């Protein structure tokens, strides 16, 4: 299955609690931290919820 790299590019400070919890659930902490996750519907939904805070790249 394909993998994606998710990078936190904007701070979740001042955002609504559900968005902050989504960032933590993705495994992101500090700015410019990144995680590599499997590309599935659940992860894509989480990315959509915080798309204004993260950038996403395909990983080979």
From Swiss-Prot:
A single cellular component GO annotation: cytosolic large ribosomal subunit
Keyword Ribosomal protein attributed: yes
One Gene Ontology term from the biological process aspect of the record: translation
Record's signal peptide: none
Protein name: Large ribosomal subunit protein uL30
PANTHER family attached to this UniProt entry: LARGE RIBOSOMAL SUBUNIT PROTEIN UL30M (PTHR15892:SF2), MITOCHONDRIAL RIBOSOMAL PROTEIN L30 (PTHR15892)
UniProt keyword annotations, A-Z: Ribonucleoprotein, Ribosomal protein
Keyword Magnesium attributed: no
Membrane-traversing stretches: none
Membership in a protein family: Belongs to the universal ribosomal protein uL30 family.
Gene3D superfamilies: Ribosomal protein L30, ferredoxin-like fold domain
Originating gene: rpmD
């Amino acid at each position: 299955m394909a993998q994606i790299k998710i990078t936190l590019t904007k701070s979740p400070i001042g955002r609504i609690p559900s968005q902050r919890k989504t960032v933590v659930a993705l495994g992101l902490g500090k700015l410019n931290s990144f995680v590599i996750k499997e590309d599935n519907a659940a992860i894509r939904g989480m990315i959509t919820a915080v798309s204004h805070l993260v950038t996403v790249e395909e990983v080979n």
